[in-house]
Amino acid sequence: MQQDFEAANPDIKLEFVTIPSQYADTMVTKLAGGEIPDVMMLAMDQVPRYALNGMLLPLDDLASQEYKDALYPVVKDALTVNGTMYAAARDVTPKVMYLNTKMFEDAGIEIPADTWTMDEFVEIAKQLTKGSGADAQWGYYWANWTDQTFAMIAAFGGELYSEDGKASVLSTDENTQKAVQFMYDLYNTYKVCPSATQAAQFGDSEFAPFMANKVAMQLGALSTASTFDANGTEYTVLPMPYVDGVSKTSSFVNTWVIPKTARNPELSWRVVEFLSGKEGQQIALDMNYGLPASTMVDTTEFEAKTPYNKYFVQALETAVPYPTNLNGSEFQNMFQKECESLWAGAVSPEEFAQRVDEQAAPILSK
C-alpha cells in the first residue's frame, strides 16, 4: 500500500507508526500533548468520542459527492456524527457464520442451505454438542465481546441504545428482548455453548475452540478466514441465519481520520483519499483486512475465489452498523459484566435487561 501511494504521490513519503496497546486512549493523550500525526486510523466506535471532543477535522468539504454516494449505507452511518462526516472508510467487516466442516463431516451432518433459519441453527448446534471432559464439544460459541453479542441482537432486529443514545433499550425493545432470551437459551436451555472457562482451555484466541475442532459454529469477519487458514482449520461460511425471513447481521468499520490540528490538512487528505478510495480499498480487500466500503471497488474477482466469499459482500446489503456512543466504552464494560451473569444463568433474561438499563441510564446520559 505504501509503495503504491508513494509511486502515485512522489512528493509525499509515508511513515507508519504503530501503537502497541491502548490505542484510542494513547492517541487522546498524544493529541492533547501536541504530538499530532497527519493521519490516524480509528475504529468506528471511537469516532464520536474524538469528534465530539473537537479532535477531528470535518471532511464534508474534502470528500467528493461521488465518494459519498458510492459508500454502502452501513458505512455512511459509521463515518458521520450529528450529520457531519468526520472519517473516511478503510474497510468494513460484516459478521458471518463460520462452520467447522470437519466437525460437520465427522457427525454426518450436511452443510445447510444459505437460506437456513435460526431454528435450523439451533437444531444443528444441539446435534453437534456432545461428550464430556476431554471429549466434550459444542455447537456454538462466542466470546463475551459486545460486538459479537450485538451481531446476534442485530439478527433479531434489536438495538442497544435509544435513538438519542441517552438510554439502553434491552427491557423496552421487543426484538432485543427476543434476542436476549435466545442467547440465554443457547447457554442455559439448549446448553450448546462452552463457558468462558471451558473455552479458555484451548488457548487465548477467541477462535481457539473452533480451531481445536471443539466448537462447530462461530461468528467471524473476513479477517477470521486468515486466522483459520494459517492454522489449517477446515471451514466454510454461511450468512447469519434468517429470522422472520431476513438474514441480518452487524458490521464494523475501520476508518481514517485527520486530526483537527494537522499541519497540512490538504496533504493529509491526499493520503486519506488514496487509502479510502478505489485503489486503497482494493489493496485492503486483497490483503483480507476487510471488505471495501465503497461500491466503486469491483468485488467480482474476490467473490470468485471461494464459493462463500459472496456472503461477505451480500451481508453489506442488510447489515446494520455496530452502535456507537460517546460513553460507549463505559457502557460496554458494564454490559459485558452483566452478560457473564446471563450466560451463567445467574439472572433471568428479564432481570438482565432491567439491570443493564438501570445501570446504563447514568452512564449514557452524561
What are these regions (language model features)?
Residues 125, 166-197:
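Glycine-centered hinge/linker elements that transmit conformational signals in sensory
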Residues 29-30, 37-38, 68-103, 136-142, ...:
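A structural signal for short loop-to-beta-strand junctions that line the ligand-binding cleft
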Residues 60-71, 113-114, 131-134, 138-139, ...:
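Short, solvent-exposed loop/beta-turn-alpha elements that line the ligand-binding surface or hinge
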Residues 44-96, 119, 236-238, 300-310:
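Hinge/lid segment of periplasmic solute-binding proteins
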Residues 1-52, 65-69, 93, 111, ...:
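Conserved N-terminal structural module of periplasmic/extracytoplasmic solute-binding proteins
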